[in-house]
């Protein structure tokens, strides 16, 4: 185990952010994540995503946990050096960029905040609502988010998105070219979604350019430590505990967390919130992050997914740690 200390429908948003710190002593996070790692490392439930060929090459045995606190401490165990593509995890941070640029009311009006109850790549959800904004964490809404980013041109838009990811991760992130090429070769469905949204005037840029940027964004590699640091920004009121930068207006953080609670685990979001009571976001690359406002963020990497596209071991691990630290936001503390 490696531990490094002192590293540089709508759910009510206020509930998701304004949670008092429990009076009990600070948990032994190092021991807790070690227990979770040992408890779940031999669980082989789920299946590695293969609809994007490059994702099928990742080992189902990969498993890593990082917990990052709002005072800049890092606790981690497992395959923490192994990078993986962000995939849908990236949606949260581009949403935050759009929120910072445009404000929460524009985001609500143009991107929405309702669960679809359908898979993350559903075209039916678009048709049933006649293109009305649903939420920015399903594929159609996430591509609309990319198109909403203020920039002079395609290159400038991508640079703003990548610079934003770098700032949140406190690192220099790069695109995984084999994953990007694999996704570009198999992204006809996303292109169709973008065209469909555009036909309903719910798209705010060129569909083909936007899909390329979105695909590039999803192909950015990250480690579980970097992901936990990104989550810790949200736990710390939009300010990075690691580089000291205010990356998101503190008053906008509850809205980002609300979107995560509504649709962060796709059509598994409701059951997750019912069981665990935390805003979270997953990606089909096997990563997942959950946020405990005012306390910590926890990130897990494990490629095998359930039927909804969420990492099985990540859900188990985060639920275990959340229960042990009384992190459920719906509990009286």
Language-model features, listed with the residues they occupy:
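Short glycine-rich loop/turn motifs
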Residues: 60-65, 192-194, 285-288
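Active-site SXXK
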Residues: 72, 84-108, 230, 298
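Bacterial N-terminal signal peptides
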Residues: 7-18
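Active-site-adjacent helix/loop patches that line small-molecule binding or acyl-intermediate pockets
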Residues: 28-35, 43-44, 98-217, 233
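Short, conserved catalytic-motif segment at the N-terminal edge
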Residues: 52-56, 68-82
